[in-house]
Amino acid sequence: MRPIAHRGCLTQYPENTLSAFRGSAPHVGMIETDVRRCGSGELVIFHDDTLDRVTDATGEVASTPMAVLEDVSVLGSGESIPRLTEVLEAVPEDVGLNLELKGRDVAAETVRVAAEYDHEVVVSSFYPDDVAAARDAGAETTAHLFYAEEPADFDVDRALDAAADLDCAYVHPDVDTCLETEVVEQARDRGFGVNAWTAETESEVLELR
């Protein structure tokens, strides 16, 4: 089992900041983060569509230029929103990166930029078209994210068929779906790696082993 720091371990650090990535990197095998495009075109690291929840600014990230994002403070930390390139430079190359695509136009550039570094990179998305775009752009490893509001209604076969059609190496089901369905066992039987999100308690981690 390999620990993955979700948004750089958001319970310990201001999420998706350089301090989060630097602080969590020595303790994990991979870091998960979110890539989207800002208003001036750069690829930046930020989870939400809007700035409101975790910064002292408001508005959509997609409409806000990098010059403004460089001056916002994430969760009162004094840290701003980093570029993708800054994260690739900050994270040691022996720590993998799971780059979740946010927005429908970032796959190809994300793959191209990440390829300039030597990290193990998994490019992931909830959206099949984005996974396919990453694969078409040359991503070596892709993953399809799964989330089920009602795990009892989750169609495991259909989900895994979709991941197979996309030539994914991994599937990323949410923890409840992992624990309440046979998705982990069936995915492994079909040759997929499985990265669950997001285990928040020791008991969940032990159940996922």
Where do the language-model regions lie?
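Catalytic domains of carbohydrate-active enzymes, especially glycoside hydrolases
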Residues: 20-37, 87, 163-171
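Structured helix-beta-strand junction loops
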Residues: 27, 64, 72, 93-94, ...
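C-terminal helical cap(s) of enzyme catalytic domains, especially alpha/beta-barrels
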Residues: 23, 43-44, 206-209
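An active-site metal/cofactor-coordinating segment within enzyme catalytic domains
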Residues: 29, 35-90, 144-147
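Entry/capping segment at the start of metal-dependent catalytic domains
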Residues: 8, 12, 16
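Short loop-to-alpha-helix "cap/lid" segments that border enzyme active sites
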Residues: 90, 100-209
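Aromatic/hydrophobic pocket-lining residues that form the small-molecule binding cavity
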Residues: 17, 80, 84, 110
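Extreme N-terminal starter segment of soluble prokaryotic enzymes
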Residues: 1-4
